[in-house]
């Protein structure tokens, strides 16, 4: 009983703070709430898709300024990996519209983009997930690789506030390899073996 009273009081406080009556909050039907949620999801997806459609070097800076919040976070490939950052300098966590545009501008100088295909799009409220695959050719070495990718984005008030891009970084880093190999031991039961041997 006490929980119900507290919940009603909290609901009344929220309603008053928003300038709404408790009756108007309780009059929202599940269908109306779903419709609002679906509209928000569609709007969030639209922002992310518009950004992805404008990632060419001549468009990405304007797209980032238009579609990215000033304090937005971009997580590229890993939260923080100094060794990977030596190979892929955009690796890590950065802030602001320039973080978004600089990633795509650098990618364009490292690889020729041969294919970028979105296979699935999911949106719920302000959250958006995009999945697909891409094929890139390294500019310096000429090696080609194909990788799956996954994007998690958050959109608030028509601007992205968070963007996380994941790919097969073993494949992307290997596209620059000129020589060398690793000796790897994955479990105690298995013997060591070499990878990257030509």
Where are these regions (language model features)?
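Bacterial N-terminal signal peptides that target proteins for export
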Residues: 2-15
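Short, low-complexity N-terminal intrinsically disordered segments enriched in polar/charged residues
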Residues: 28-70, 183-198
